[in-house]
Amino acid sequence: MDPSGPGFQRSWSMKSLIICVSTSHGNTRRVADRMAEVLDAEVVEPESVDPENLCQYDLVGFGSGIYYMSVDTRLRKLIRRLPHVDGIRAFTFLTSGAGQIPLLDYSKPVRNQLASKGFKVLGSFTCRGFDTVGPFGFIGGINRGRPNDHDLEHAAAFAARVRIRVAGSPAAS
């Protein structure tokens, strides 16, 4: 059965939330919106999240662009404020102009913080995004048109795999 198709949703329902910070060009929001289609999730900004209410969700996504080699301050602040939870499934997703630098796993600090709060982190998705920050602005930016359709389909496939993992877990029934 196609996990992104309507038959899957009818056979099992889960409550999902995607928390997203997307400031410069809307790169991360485009990824969040595509994942939300697959997960039937609401996409919100960190300021609109009541940390105490996250226990209502089966799955929570945390997404941000990478700004000067780190996730956005607003997402970091929200994660610090989160209470300890009992195994809520989570995932991370990031967009970056420079792409993933092999020795710098941008999602690792976020994954570790979420795990320390009791979240079960199921995976991370990253892709390139259009970037005009700093010196890139002088040359018209890098990765124009990213994330592109191919990137968004990869994001949807990632979300579908996460959805299957949540549906197959004992806590999901």
Model-assigned labels for residue ranges:
Residues 46-49:
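Conserved SAM/SAH-binding loop
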Residues 9, 16-23, 29-30, 34-44, ...:
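FMN-binding flavodoxin-like domain, especially the glycine-rich phosphate-binding loop
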Residues 3-13:
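Short, Lys/Arg-enriched N-terminal segments with co-localized hydrophobic residues
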Residues 1-4, 145:
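Selective for proline/serine-rich intrinsically disordered segments
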